[in-house]
């Protein structure tokens, strides 16, 4: 599976204080919806990923329900956070 430039840039360095839109699959529209729901930073969304026990199905469903993220974009976000976790924790 090939990854986007956005994905590679995100997983290539510590998360720090990056905006949620820095995560692959999360563009401006989904970013606004997530921010409105309280998930404005990448680390906040990463916390939700951890709360859902790194489970792809649960995380994808949660993103779909919370911000109307499509399944494809939600899977991109999951893969991005999952690969980041494998490298940094």
Swiss-Prot record:
Keywords associated with the record: DNA-binding, Nucleus, Phosphoprotein
An example Gene Ontology biological process: chromosome organization
One MF term in the entry's GO annotations: DNA binding
Lineage: superkingdom: Eukaryota
Record bears the keyword Phosphoprotein: yes
Subcellular location: Nucleus
GO CC, one annotated term: nucleus
Keyword Thylakoid attributed: no
Processing after translation: Phosphorylated by vrk-1. Phosphorylation by vrk-1 in mitosis is essential to achieve correct timing of recruitment of nuclear envelope components during nuclear envelope assembly. Dephosphorylated by protein phosphatase 2A (PP2A) following interaction with lem-4l during mitotic exit, leading to mitotic nuclear envelope reassembly.
TM regions (residue ranges): none
Family: Belongs to the BAF family.
Its biological purpose: DNA-binding protein which plays an essential role in nuclear envelope formation. Required for normal chromosome segregation during mitosis. Associates with the nuclear lamina via its interaction with LEM domain containing proteins emr-1 and lem-2.
Subunit record text: Interacts with emr-1 and lem-2. Interacts with lem-4l, leading to decreased phosphorylation by VRK1 and promoting dephosphorylation by protein phosphatase 2A (PP2A).
Name this protein carries in UniProt: Barrier-to-autointegration factor 1
Naturally occurring in which organism (per UniProt): Caenorhabditis briggsae
Lineage: Eukaryota, Metazoa, Ecdysozoa, Nematoda, Chromadorea
Gene name in the database record: baf-1
